[in-house]
Regions:
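Short, well-ordered beta-strand core segments
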Residues: 2, 22, 47-49
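A short acidic, Gly/Pro-enriched loop at the edge of an enzyme's catalytic core
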Residues: 12-21
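A short SAM/SAH-binding and catalytic strip from SAM-dependent methyltransferases
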Residues: 20-34, 52
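Conserved SAM-binding strand-loop segment of SAM-dependent methyltransferases
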Residues: 1-13
Length: 136
């Protein structure tokens, strides 16, 4: 089943339903309360796949050094048109998972071409453009 709901508003309608997997694709950074959303989703699903852009990527950092809000192929919107509320890096997200005791079962770091690479895997906070997590 596919269910779409405003997760910022809560997911009370689905408590106790016991989904196997929930997917939050490139949306965690758009939520008002991402920590609460992750807590709530893991109450109704055994696992959650979360994908997020890495705002610590070197290309975005370079944009900031130039004095402008950065954009990239993964984040093409201008600062005044973006839905992103919480800009986080891979290190920030993994820190939140540790803080909340969310078990990261698997993680994949993707470069700007959308593939895994030695640089993205070795220095993900600097060279990964996006990350994919399986948490439970």
């Amino acid at each position: 089943s596919v269910i779409q709901q405003d997760i910022d508003g809560g997911i009370q309608n689905y408590k106790g339903m016991g989904f196997d997997v929930a997917i939050m694709a490139s949306s965690i950074q758009c939520l008002r309360r991402p920590r609460n959303a992750m807590r709530n989703i893991l109450q109704v699903a055994n696992e959650c796949v979360i994908t997020l852009p890495n705002f610590g990527n070197w290309e975005l950092r370079l944009g900031l050094l130039k004095g402008k809000m950065p954009s990239s192929a993964q984040l093409p919107a201008k600062w005044y048109e973006t839905k992103n509320l919480h800009l986080c890096t891979i290190a920030d997200f993994e820190g939140l998972c540790a803080e909340e005791s969310f078990n990261i079962k698997k993680k994949v770091y993707l470069n700007t071409r959308g593939s895994s690479s030695w640089l993205a895997n070795t220095f993900p906070n600097l060279f990964a453009a996006e990350a994919v997590y399986l948490i439970g």
